[in-house]
């Protein structure tokens, strides 16, 4: 007999886990649409060269890749941004610009599983393609803020930076040709600390200890946002690339505040580098104040050159990705997920065979009123059925036996409190029952 099991880093989702996932995804859809983003989808498998064109060595190592039945090298998407760049290059003539899209779908990475990290996980992405306007950058911050608030999270921090500032500093240090390895090392600062990060820059990127120290002094620039912005020109030595990055970062920060983002939730952090090579401008990461150790739950940035791998048309982009599984793991750790394992709140026991059609009619009338109902399929003892309803997380049970049907009333039982009330009901007059159920489940 084959042992039923899942691969390491992969999971089954029971109803109690899947229901909040779907609720969170629906919340994300509503927020994205409120900003004018439209849904798309792309294939799970892409030509391997599409996926490896502008990732990083680390990303390439994590790719699930193989030859398909036709001998073609293919890979499973590791994020939704690279497929978007291919999608935009292929369809932008039809779509027009600016093109705003959201995409909620699974991605796969062969990384080491740990708390909040899996080899298969869902990303919720939103992106704007075809504009370099600072308004698109500001809007991205506003979407993240609106999304987390809609999910019900109040204590979070959106940290923003501009890669141009780091790039400009590296230019002034004579390290323009070593930007990628330096930024990749810098991206680990929060995880491995200053000393190990400096050593990695020296060993992996081939910079001097003095150059590594200059990069880290910039990354460690701290204080309130306005003081950081004021200090950056001197730290970067007046480099033009850095100056343009500082100006853009200032516009984004002040624009987000003007849009209503709370200053308590917005932070300038020039240590953020982001590991992927395709970011060119503003970058951001979002952490939960109560669980900083779980990492960023929403991150992204501007990638003005990514689509250039697939088209000669200049298609700048800006966007971010919500880590759905990591966020759900965080909400579970915080005790903010309900134990509901049923998508509907109302349970109808079926224990009088002679009134089978009455039970079905009652359930249909409630569904027509927008109330989800489950009718138990077997005429077992009432106690057994109510025990099942309790275990499944139903809010209300509607109890009706022969006496109730004859009397023209049913019993509405709130399962959490065990309280019951008799409510008038007939197939011709269901309104009182509908109102009672709505009150009990609101």
UniProtKB/Swiss-Prot annotation:
GO terms classed as biological process: histidyl-tRNA aminoacylation
Disulfide topology: none
Localization terms from the record: Cytoplasm
Keyword Nucleus: no
Broad class of where this protein is predominantly found: cytoplasm
Keyword annotations of the record: Aminoacyl-tRNA synthetase, ATP-binding, Cytoplasm, Ligase, Nucleotide-binding, Protein biosynthesis
Gene Ontology CC terms: cytoplasm
The enzyme's E.C. designation: 6.1.1.21
GO molecular function ontology, one term from the record: ATP binding
First-level EC class: ligase
PANTHER family: HISTIDINE--TRNA LIGASE, HISTIDYL-TRNA SYNTHETASE
Protein family: Belongs to the class-II aminoacyl-tRNA synthetase family.
Designated name of the protein: Histidine--tRNA ligase
Source species of the chain: Rhodopirellula baltica (strain DSM 10527 / NCIMB 13988 / SH1)
